[in-house]
């Protein structure tokens, strides 16, 4: 790992922490982050030439795998015509049409450049539409680095938000209510106390930033019911789950239609992207047709649109997602079987092509408190053992894993063989 070490030393002199996103730093698992230079299919190669089976997939976007030939061809073809124009382009219309065709809640959509932009803009729009200020979010859910959503809960099941990091003023999060995820009773209590003041509820329909925790039966239904009852808007943050848990996203999988949806990751096929959309009457409140302002220099970038459209064609093709979900199940069940054989307590969750590994015997894992109580040291040992074996998992116990269409039988078997050896070392 000589070249990786050298690059990280250089990076730490020039970039805070040596990384451009904190989770990449390996702070949660220990050691130094690995620098990668190439990917193909389900594999990545680091700068020292070692190959890994990849279950991070760029934190979700690469549902077709690395350097898919058709996606690369479409990107190259589009880039040759110009990287950006700052004007409307045909590809953004095609992307908007594609999203509205596949995502049940979308009648109109606005394209942006990141998931954070999508959630930030959706909140502003919800407040503008309802004329209310309070936002409900859930413990363990992450919605980007939006000040109003970097709130943490205080003591008790239901509290007003307090800042979750330095630099976030108390006044900014004062209108943020934080409720335990998957706690139906707490949701009811929240709306009984504050329902007439709540502009919106924002939720990851499958929590992917407390590892991978699907909704318990009745949870999403309760959110829809209380929002309908109080005229609050329901916002699904599907930046991670969009086209990852089903070809119609989480809302199609679970049969609950939100008022607004935030998207990202897969929609850009590996390029920077975000999107938010919903009912026409709400979306027409955005400038220039309405008074809620939102803008972006590179929004609807043609190269991003090309990559995203090519990716969406792959994942929405007949039978594609079903095959991907079956592959994911083979990976998850295979790892669980090998943990059981080694006498290692391991709980697993899966939602489509997302999965979670929890070093605990407290199953099923449905609550953030359970996630925090897992054996983090065991996860860290397993992570490094798998890394040694050539399998790249998310370098944090609180992050979901991802499988791609490119993960074939060889990649799966290589992973399971590595897991068997790794559990012997844990």
From Swiss-Prot:
The keyword Cytoplasm applies. Pfam families: Aminotran_3. Disulfide bonds: none annotated. GO terms for molecular function: glutamate-1-semialdehyde 2,1-aminomutase activity; pyridoxal phosphate binding; transaminase activity. This is Glutamate-1-semialdehyde 2,1-aminomutase. Its cofactor is pyridoxal 5'-phosphate. The modification N6-(pyridoxal phosphate)lysine is found at residue 265. It comes from Halorhodospira halophila (strain DSM 244 / SL1) (Ectothiorhodospira halophila (strain DSM 244 / SL1)).
């Amino acid at each position: 790992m000589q070249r990786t070490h050298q690059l990280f030393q250089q990076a730490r002199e020039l970039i805070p922490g040596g990384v451009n996103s904190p989770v990449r730093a390996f702070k949660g698992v220990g050691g130094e982050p690995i620098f990668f230079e190439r990917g193909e299919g389900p594999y990545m190669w680091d700068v020292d030439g070692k190959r890994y089976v990849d279950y991070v997939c760029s934190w979700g976007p690469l549902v077709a795998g690395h350097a898919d030939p058709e996606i690369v061809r479409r990107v190259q073809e589009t880039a040759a015509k110009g990287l950006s124009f700052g004007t409307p382009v045909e590809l953004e219309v095609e992307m908007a049409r594609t999203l509205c065709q596949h995502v049940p809640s979308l009648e109109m959509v606005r394209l942006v450049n990141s998931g954070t932009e999508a959630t930030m803009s959706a909140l502003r729009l919800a407040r503008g539409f309802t004329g209310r200020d309070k936002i409900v979010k859930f413990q363990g859910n992450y919605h980007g680095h939006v000040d109003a959503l970097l709130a943490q809960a205080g003591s008790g099941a239901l509290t007003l938000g307090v800042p979750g990091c330095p630099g976030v003023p108390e006044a900014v999060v004062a209108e943020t209510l934080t409720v335990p995820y998957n706690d139906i009773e707490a949701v009811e209590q929240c709306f009984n106390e504050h329902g007439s003041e709540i502009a919106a509820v924002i939720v990851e329909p499958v929590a992917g930033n407390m590892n991978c925790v699907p909704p318990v039966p009745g949870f999403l239904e309760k959110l829809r019911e209380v929002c309908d009852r109080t005229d609050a808007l329901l916002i699904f943050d599907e930046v991670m789950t969009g086209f990852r848990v089903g070809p119609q996203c989480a809302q199609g999988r679970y049969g609950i239609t939100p008022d607004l949806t935030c998207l990202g990751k897969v929609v850009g096929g590996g390029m920077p992207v975000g999107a938010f959309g919903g009912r026409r009457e709400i979306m027409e409140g955005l400038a220039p047709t309405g008074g809620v302002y939102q803008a972006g220099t590179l929004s609807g970038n043609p190269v991003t649109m090309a990559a995203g459209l090519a990716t969406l064609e792959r994942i929405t093709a007949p039978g594609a997602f079903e095959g991907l979900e079956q592959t994911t199940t083979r990976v998850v069940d295979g790892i669980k079987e090998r943990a059981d054989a080694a006498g290692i307590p391991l709980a697993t969750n899966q939602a489509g092509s997302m999965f979670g590994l929890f070093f605990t015997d407290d199953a099923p894992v449905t609550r953030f408190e359970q996630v925090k109580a897992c054996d983090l040291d065991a996860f860290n040992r397993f992570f490094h053992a798998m890394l040694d074996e050539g399998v790249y998992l998310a370098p944090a116990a609180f992050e979901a894993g991802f499988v791609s269409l490119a993960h074939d039988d060889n990649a799966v078997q290589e992973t399971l063989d590595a897991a068997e050896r790794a559990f012997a070392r844990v």
